[in-house]
Curated annotation (Swiss-Prot):
<feature type="binding site">
    <location>
        <position position="10"/>
    </location>
    <ligand>
        <name>NADPH</name>
    </ligand>
</feature>
<feature type="binding site">
    <location>
        <position position="231"/>
    </location>
    <ligand>
        <name>1-deoxy-D-xylulose 5-phosphate</name>
    </ligand>
</feature>
<feature type="binding site">
    <location>
        <position position="152"/>
    </location>
    <ligand>
        <name>Mn(2+)</name>
    </ligand>
</feature>
<feature type="binding site">
    <location>
        <position position="125"/>
    </location>
    <ligand>
        <name>1-deoxy-D-xylulose 5-phosphate</name>
    </ligand>
</feature>
<feature type="binding site">
    <location>
        <position position="126"/>
    </location>
    <ligand>
        <name>NADPH</name>
    </ligand>
</feature>
<dbReference type="InterPro" id="IPR013644">
    <property type="entry name" value="DXP_reductoisomerase_C"/>
</dbReference>
<feature type="binding site">
    <location>
        <position position="228"/>
    </location>
    <ligand>
        <name>1-deoxy-D-xylulose 5-phosphate</name>
    </ligand>
</feature>
<dbReference type="InterPro" id="IPR036169">
    <property type="entry name" value="DXPR_C_sf"/>
</dbReference>
<dbReference type="Pfam" id="PF13288">
    <property type="entry name" value="DXPR_C"/>
</dbReference>
<feature type="binding site">
    <location>
        <position position="152"/>
    </location>
    <ligand>
        <name>1-deoxy-D-xylulose 5-phosphate</name>
    </ligand>
</feature>
<feature type="binding site">
    <location>
        <position position="12"/>
    </location>
    <ligand>
        <name>NADPH</name>
    </ligand>
</feature>
<dbReference type="InterPro" id="IPR036291">
    <property type="entry name" value="NAD(P)-bd_dom_sf"/>
</dbReference>
<dbReference type="GO" id="GO:0051484">
    <property type="term" value="P:isopentenyl diphosphate biosynthetic process, methylerythritol 4-phosphate pathway involved in terpenoid biosynthetic process"/>
</dbReference>
<feature type="binding site">
    <location>
        <position position="13"/>
    </location>
    <ligand>
        <name>NADPH</name>
    </ligand>
</feature>
<keyword id="KW-0521">NADP</keyword>
<comment type="similarity">
    <text>Belongs to the DXR family.</text>
</comment>
<dbReference type="InterPro" id="IPR013512">
    <property type="entry name" value="DXP_reductoisomerase_N"/>
</dbReference>
Amino acid sequence: MRKLTILGATGSIGSSTLSVAQQNSDQFEIVALGAGTNVDKMLELCLEWKPKYVAMATQPAADALKELLSAHAINAEVFSGEDGLCHIAQLDEVDTVMAAIVGAAGLLPTMSAVKASKRILLANKEALVMSGQLFIDAVEKYGAELLPVDSEHNAIFQCLPQSIQTNLGRCDLEEHGVSSILLTGSGGPFRYTDVSELEAVTPEMAIAHPNWSMGPKISVDSATMMNKGLEYIEARWLFNASKEQLKVVIHPQSVIHSMVQYKDGSVLAQMGLPDMRTPIACTMSYPKRVNAGVEPLDFTKVGEFTFIAPDFSRYPCLKLAIDACYLGQHATTGLNAANEQAVAAFLANKIKFTDIARINEAVLHKVCANFQNLELDSLESLIDLDRMARRYADEAINKV
């Protein structure tokens, strides 16, 4: 039986992970749950799952949860802050960690799980975007096991031979006959909207994704296609891919989750309904298969598959991310930080939808001008750069 810590338990990935665990209760035990500040949701989860350990991102949230758990006679040990989340990521009695905390906040807890040699189910793409080679080196150094949860990376993973699956970040695609990786994306809710109308997009419009059920931040990232840009950077590190080996294709139906093209002309694609329980179940049970609770794909109802080249005038954030990928670690760390601040400002109605790309571009230029030669050889140096980029972004937001 696999024993799990779920980081980001109250979010959409956490919910889907618990759904898969419930479908296969004889194979998975929930030992620890970690979350941000959603005390009410965490209380519900504790009442249902009875974890031994819980961690909340802030002390007030942890204190409030302790009080509620005591009132319900639940004996879970409650930790707080980044240290608390890192602690439950490296518990001796846990062998598998679902890393699903959104954004840069997930980096240190995920790295703690790596250093404790856990099986890492990586749903937090920002961890790799922010730390790149440092993360890949740590996985090898500490003997951790890395399995990608993002639907696209999981699809690519499933289309690659086992010798690559067990050597992520250090594989040689060409040696295995791979000519290219085709990263698919839906294009978000505004793929057919006139570009001149994008300035008027509201947060409510942006978070209404046509295919996937996701949290607000990732929904906005999907609308700008920054999400695909971050996934592009993550794919570069996970699969040790060159610029020539990575391509982005818009596929509005979200049925083909990504593809791998081989030298002999073969193309392997992973397909399924747009439901995160499928890639989550794949990683939770790897190399076996378990019931994810997902309806089988009915090809007679799919109708057709459409593929479109991305239009960078519509999706400037995607172009920024692809460019940043080859400028260096300072660029991807800085861009990710800027985007988190810009999306938060948009969701708070402080800036327009189209300002997100402008702020990201301004911060990327500033980071590249000031930190191009900075040696990013530790988590501390990456976090310092992340903070500085957020400061630049906040300054740009205040000028809008």
